[in-house]
Amino acid sequence: MKAMQAKIPRALATGSRMVCSDNTGARLVEVVSVDRYHGVRRRQPCLGLGDVATVSVKKGTPDMRRKLEKAVVIRQKKEIRRPNGIRLSFEDNAMVLINERGEPKGTEIKGAVPREIAERFPKIASMATTIV
């Protein structure tokens, strides 16, 4: 996985509910666990922009609900800082469902996607409407 240039704060914890910003049929997802997180005892696992997590689909089509899926965070409200000094934040926290190889399950992504995600997940970038 490619390293990110920007300073990404881990602002989302397990149990956070986020909008699913693709057309897979899931509308609201809840973070169950964070992949590749090796923490300290009793510390709540946190995730930020570009992190992959296991999520439970809470709202959506009947065939998608109550399933565990992999997802990546594509937007977060907490601002990120780029090396040139620009600070970037979004209006919502959003995720996109992915498969085991890191490719998106849907065929369309709603909303803007930051450049850091475009570098790490090129397939998500090709489907995004706007890259910021």
Curated annotation (Swiss-Prot):
Q: Looking at the UniProt record for this protein, which Gene Ontology cellular component terms does it annotate, in alphabetical order? A: cytosolic large ribosomal subunit
Biological role stated in the UniProt entry: Binds to 23S rRNA. Forms part of two intersubunit bridges in the 70S ribosome.
Which BP terms does GO give this entry?
translation
State the similarity comment.
Answer: Belongs to the universal ribosomal protein uL14 family.
The molecular function terms of the Gene Ontology recorded here are: large ribosomal subunit rRNA binding; structural constituent of ribosome
Top-level taxon in the UniProt lineage: Archaea
Q: Which gene codes for it? A: rpl14
* Swiss-Prot/TrEMBL keywords: Ribonucleoprotein, Ribosomal protein, RNA-binding, rRNA-binding
Q: Which organism is it from?
A: Methanoculleus marisnigri (strain ATCC 35101 / DSM 1498 / JR1)
Q: Which InterPro entries match?
A: Ribosomal_uL14 (IPR000218), Ribosomal_uL14_arc (IPR019971), Ribosomal_uL14_CS (IPR019972), Ribosomal_uL14_sf (IPR036853)
User: What is the name listed in the Swiss-Prot or TrEMBL entry for this protein?
Assistant: Large ribosomal subunit protein uL14
Assembly and partners? Part of the 50S ribosomal subunit. Forms a cluster with proteins L3 and L24e, part of which may contact the 16S rRNA in 2 intersubunit bridges.
Please name one Pfam family that this protein belongs to: Ribosomal_L14
